[in-house]
C-alpha cells in the first residue's frame, strides 16, 4: 500500500499506536496497583463481631503477637480484621466441616472437633464467659486490664484454670491458630497488612519463579514478597 505525501506512513502509525498502548498499559497497571489505605482499626466496622467481641479480639491478639517485639505485631498487621472476616465466612460457620454428632468434649484433640458449636459460636459464647471470669478474678473485663494482667488471664485460659465448659475448651486453641493465620496469611484475606510479616521472616510470597532458590540455605532472599493479587512488598 502506497503512503500519501504529508501523512504518516502505515508503519509509523502502527509503531506509534503500539507505543501508546504500551504506555497506557503501564500507566493503568501502576494505577491498579495503587490501593487506598484501609480504615484504621479504630474506625473499622466488623462484619460479624459485636463491639465487646471486637474489643476482646483486639486486646487478645495484641498480647499473643505483641507490638513491642523486633517485628510487626498483630495490630500493625491487622490480624483482628482477618479473624472477623473468617468468622463471617465459611470458616466461622464450619460450612465444609463434618458437624454431625455424637460429640465427646472430653475426647483427645486427635479425634477432631468435638463440639456442636462452630468457630463463630465458640467465640460468641466463650468471650462473655471469659470476660465474666476476668471481672471476678481481676476486677475488669479482659480488654480493660493492663497488659501484664492480660497475659496472666490468657495463660489461665490456655491451661484451663478457669474450668470453662467442655463445649468451649477449643476456644484458646482456635484463637491462637486464627491469630497466627491472620499474621502470615496473604493480605487478600485481611491480615498481614503490607506483607509486613512476610518481610519480617524473608518469605517470598506468591512469586511465580522460585526454583533457583529452593536449594539455597542460610542465604537471605534479595527480593521482597509478592501477594496473590500481584502486590509487591
Where do the protein language model's features map onto the residues?
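Hydrophobic h-region of N-terminal signal peptides that target proteins for export
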Residues: 23-27
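Short N-terminal segments immediately surrounding and downstream of signal-peptide cleavage
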Residues: 35-49
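Boundary at the C-terminal end of the N-terminal hydrophobic targeting segment
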Residues: 29-34
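Mature-region segments of soluble proteins
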Residues: 2-3, 41-43, 52-59, 70-233
Amino acid at each position: 500500500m502506497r503512503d500519501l505525501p504529508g501523512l504518516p506512513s502505515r508503519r509509523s502509525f502502527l509503531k506509534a499506536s503500539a507505543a501508546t498502548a504500551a504506555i497506557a498499559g503501564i500507566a493503568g497497571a501502576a494505577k491498579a496497583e495503587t490501593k487506598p489505605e484501609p480504615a484504621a482499626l479504630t474506625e473499622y466496622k466488623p462484619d460479624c463481631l459485636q463491639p465487646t467481641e471486637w474489643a476482646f479480639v483486639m486486646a487478645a491478639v495484641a498480647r499473643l503477637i505483641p507490638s513491642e517485639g523486633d517485628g510487626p505485631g498483630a495490630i500493625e498487621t491487622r490480624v483482628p480484621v482477618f479473624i472477623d472476616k473468617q468468622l463471617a465466612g465459611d470458616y466461622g460457620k464450619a460450612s465444609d466441616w463434618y458437624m454431625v454428632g455424637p460429640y465427646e468434649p472430653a475426647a483427645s484433640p486427635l479425634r477432631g472437633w468435638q463440639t456442636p458449636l462452630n468457630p463463630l459460636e465458640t467465640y460468641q459464647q466463650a468471650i462473655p464467659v471469659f470476660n465474666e471470669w476476668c471481672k471476678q478474678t481481676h476486677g475488669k473485663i479482659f480488654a480493660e486490664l493492663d497488659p501484664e494482667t492480660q497475659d496472666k488471664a490468657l495463660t489461665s485460659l490456655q491451661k484451663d484454670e478457669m474450668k470453662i465448659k467442655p463445649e468451649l475448651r477449643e476456644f484458646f486453641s482456635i484463637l491462637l491458630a486464627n491469630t497466627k493465620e491472620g499474621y502470615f496469611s496473604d493480605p487478600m484475606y485481611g491480615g498481614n497488612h503490607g506483607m509486613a510479616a512476610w518481610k519480617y521472616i524473608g518469605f517470598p510470597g506468591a512469586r511465580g519463579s522460585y526454583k533457583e532458590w529452593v536449594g539455597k540455605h542460610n542465604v537471605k532472599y534479595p527480593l521482597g514478597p509478592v501477594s496473590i493479587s500481584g502486590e509487591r512488598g
